[in-house]
Amino acid sequence: MKKGIRYETSRKTSYIFQQPQHGPWQTRMRKISNHGSLRVAKVAYPLGLCVGVFIYVAYIKWHRATATQAFFSITRAAPGARWGQQAHSPLGTAADGHEVFYGIMFDAGSTGTRVHVFQFTRPPRETPTLTHETFKALKPGLSAYADDVEKSAQGIRELLDVAKQDIPFDFWKATPLVLKATAGLRLLPGEKAQKLLQKVKKVFKASPFLVGDDCVSIMNGTDEGVSAWITINFLTGSLKTPGGSSVGMLDLGGGSTQIAFLPRVEGTLQASPPGYLTALRMFNRTYKLYSYSYLGLGLMSARLAILGGVEGQPAKDGKELVSPCLSPSFKGEWEHAEVTYRVSGQKAAASLHELCAARVSEVLQNRVHRTEEVKHVDFYAFSYYYDLAAGVGLIDAEKGGSLVVGDFEIAAKYVCRTLETQPQSSPFSCMDLTYVSLLLQEFGFPRSKVLKLTRKIDNVETSWALGAIFHYIDSLNRQKSPAS
């Protein structure tokens, strides 16, 4: 394992599929007698050759027809896809007759790159079911290679090998391969981000998987929120019940934070600012979602803003960043987006939490839209919401759990008070908990609002990746009619 690369453990569940059957053409060898005249031999050999050629051509035609049929039943057509890459064999079928297909999603985040390999089964005339997921991740994120693009290819190839090992060979050429980059690349200068994406696309094009012109892109914040909403509602079963109740989602990443839910109140739709509503079509139904991503309000970017720094820029003249959210005696260094900052606390004229809350409120002022309907919608929260809650014992670190929004404030006050006299190994804990507490209240959540915090539902990670590949495959099916 090369230095600087750290892998997460993979997770697999078993699946069943039938190996593709051999073609219907069976040739039988029989011995041709050498007795007889030379004339008989001259006729027999050419005749046998012709029969063999006929059988071979017929087999090839049958093989291509079934492969093409399988390809279109999985993904109708991707714009710019390499059409020579149809599946070698018919679509896999589980023992119960359900169709089997795969999707690969690369999540290029601000702190690392992760590959998700999904296997789906689809009962006849029903919505698909996720039956298998494998993921692995490596650090750092793609943005770390902004000044040395060639180095980014090695990690991408290593993660592609994970997909090759997990997906049966006969499915490779019909399996969509997609990379979506999030806040890490959004914050890079446009030219640097595009060079990274072009390098990844080149690596993808050389892979054996199905690659379209849109296989590599920077995901806008709204789509990130929508994809996470799909994941949560797919895993909870809400998408399988037309008109059934749905749940909202809260995602707190390093560079951005998202909120998404399905409004049931007309007033929410009318009061939403431009860009906060998006139409989503899934399973032949259309959903009008409230979804928005706040770039710069992810936990790491918020830290920098609270410290008084500027994204992507070192402190002027190496100046130390001083914050009321740190222990008064703290001095140290903090690295963010490949920039190292010198940071320190300051003497407190009041309680640490009180001063920190005032500073966080300044950062959040007029940055977040508040909606009343969130009070009445069940919400799942994950990513840094989960990590922070688990870190201070509000939920079980492995199983997750439920809490009320006010628990974050209680934890923040306790940690901040402790830091005033006993500097801890987590110098940013007071700042982070205070930030999350006030962010949730800015969204409109009362302190008594219950949130469900989880990393997994039915042993599947609650990230946007599942929703994104699911939506991608669904859109491919709509772009190409069966008759084409």
Curated annotation (Swiss-Prot):
Residues 61-484 are lumenal. Glycans are attached at residues 220, 284. It holds the Pfam family GDA1_CD39. It comes from the Eukaryota. Catalyzes the hydrolysis of nucleoside triphosphates and diphosphates in a calcium- or magnesium-dependent manner. Has a strong preference for nucleoside diphosphates, preferentially hydrolyzes GDP, IDP, and UDP, with slower hydrolysis of CDP, ITP, GTP, CTP, ADP, and UTP and virtually no hydrolysis of ATP. The membrane bound form might support glycosylation reactions in the Golgi apparatus and, when released from cells, might catalyze the hydrolysis of extracellular nucleotides. Belongs to the GDA1/CD39 NTPase family. GO terms for biological process: response to calcium ion; response to magnesium ion. The chain crosses the membrane at residues 40-60. Residues 1-39 are cytoplasmic. Changing residue 215 to S: Does not affect nucleoside-triphosphatase activity. Does not affeet KM for GDP. It is a single-pass type II membrane protein. Monomer. Its main location: Golgi. This is Ectonucleoside triphosphate diphosphohydrolase 6. GO terms for cellular component: cell surface; extracellular region; extracellular space; Golgi apparatus; Golgi membrane; plasma membrane.
